[in-house]
């Protein structure tokens, strides 16, 4: 509220011009990003209702949590929407085709492995994606723990084969006995020898590159 006062704004612009410009840009980006999300939600509401909420009304939008990932394209970021009745929904400001193709690869493998995988439901539009929010839940017995790590081993193989990186704890949801990968943009990062010194070459050509294993 103080920034609404003319003398305060003048003090900021003259004493801290770079800081003032930074704050101004942050506010403008936040407003633009908020309006974009709301407008896209309204445009996609019918599809969202059918895809994620079984055709029911999720209730009013209680809150929006910004900044769940890095900012891109003038402040856009992954965002969490909280609804009055139906829980939560993730907004991704990009088209994520990998969320369609990766489950197909897992289903193909599961035809032989028969262990089952879990993936978030997605509604993909031309320039953004709505993603099911999956809660962290614990395993209830040792059999579930065993199956969790069995599935994790399959994912480790796939991540290695697809040159994936950055699959640390923030990009994996433990949903009971199912590890769920949530940031598939980390796929396809081929090894670039000119980017690393000799100490990094071994790491970059191993399963440790994925970040899935503790090291």
Residue ranges and their predicted role:
Residues 133, 137-215:
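Conserved kinase catalytic-core segment
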Residues 1-164, 178-180:
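Conserved ATP-binding subdomain of kinase catalytic cores across diverse folds
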